[in-house]
């Protein structure tokens, strides 16, 4: 039975958690109040999403291990996104496999979409249409489809999103859903078939291993701040190696990445804390910010409100 969900998010943590089939660890890197819209459409075999985000962000993506698919820009004139440090322009799509983590970075506000099938369905459709499988289990890479194929994919994806928002009852009808699904799957396959691609499997294997160790270290210290000396020691790499890896995959130095991580940890702590029992100064110090004035200015610039306002609000209460 087809299902549809259209949602708006102001909390990036909830937004990342709401992207189904992918485990996402990420945070916003732009300044201001976050807002994102998500349209999810589950057809018979095909799952698709449409996303509209107003601030740049970095996401480390862990696939579910059951579905492979593609992502692409929905707007023809928007800044390029990056997948594993490789630019994916509005004339390309990125395809991702079943079991390899990858990074997705936006440089500004963006609209992007995804489509996915199970490995078995992907293999069956690829064999039926072209005689071979089109997405491997570990592959993540950029593809440059023919302009006509990509245009058709975008148009069908947009039409499905429009139906989901305006007349969802029609899209939920099995015969309509099946027809749209067939058109979308066919369009996706023609984008993937025989398209030149930039293969990331054999590029920078050493840096990919460093990034996996970096993320494992961050995961092991998910609720506490890390500093450069500790990070380099636990990852087993020099600062310069970490810097090169982070610049390629994340678009920023490891020092900046750790600073942003500490800021987001402090934001989470402020939102969860009881203002009667703790202070902004205590929370800031817990996460390595000892100059309260500088912290307050940076916090307001990054999140659009003062840390004292975040603390006074009841836990999990929405912003007004």
Predicted regions mapped to residue ranges:
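N-terminal low-complexity or simple alpha-helical regulatory segments
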Residues: 1-66, 70-72
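Short, conserved glycine- and acidic-residue-centered signature motifs
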Residues: 63, 207, 259
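C-terminal structural cap/anchor segments
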Residues: 237, 247, 256-259
């Amino acid at each position: 039975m087809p299902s549809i969900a259209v949602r708006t998010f102001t909390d990036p943590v909830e937004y990342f958690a709401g992207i189904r089939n992918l485990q996402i660890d990420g945070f916003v890197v732009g300044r201001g109040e976050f807002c994102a819209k998500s349209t999810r459409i589950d057809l018979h075999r095909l799952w698709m999403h449409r996303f509209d985000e107003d601030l740049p962000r970095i996401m480390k993506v862990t696939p579910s291990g059951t579905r492979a698919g593609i992502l692409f820009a929905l707007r023809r004139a928007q800044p390029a996104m990056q997948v594993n440090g490789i630019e994916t322009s509005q004339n390309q799509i990125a395809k991702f496999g079943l079991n390899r983590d990858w990074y997705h970075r936006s440089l500004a506000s963006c609209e992007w979409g995804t489509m996915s099938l199970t490995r078995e369905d992907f293999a069956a459709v690829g064999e039926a249409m072209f005689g071979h499988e089109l997405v491997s289990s570990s592959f993540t890479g950029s593809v440059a489809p023919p302009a006509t194929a990509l245009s058709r994919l975008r148009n069908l994806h947009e039409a499905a999103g429009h139906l989901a928002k305006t007349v969802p009852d029609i899209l939920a009808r099995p015969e309509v859903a099946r027809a749209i699904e067939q058109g979308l799957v066919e369009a996706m396959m023609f984008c993937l078939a025989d398209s030149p691609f930039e293969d990331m499997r054999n590029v920078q294997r050493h840096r990919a291993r460093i990034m996996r160790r970096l993320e494992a270290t961050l995961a092991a210290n998910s609720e506490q701040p890390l500093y450069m000396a500790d990070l380099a020691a636990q990852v087993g790499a020099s600062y310069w190696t970490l810097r090169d890896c982070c610049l390629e995959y994340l678009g920023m130095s490891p020092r900046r990445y750790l600073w942003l991580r500490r800021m987001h940890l402090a934001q989470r702590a402020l939102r969860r804390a009881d203002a009667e029992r703790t202070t902004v100064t205590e929370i800031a110090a817990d996460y390595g910010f000892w100059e309260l004035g500088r912290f307050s200015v940076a916090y307001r610039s990054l999140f659009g409100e003062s840390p004292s306002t975040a603390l006074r609000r009841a836990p999990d209460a929405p912003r007004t």
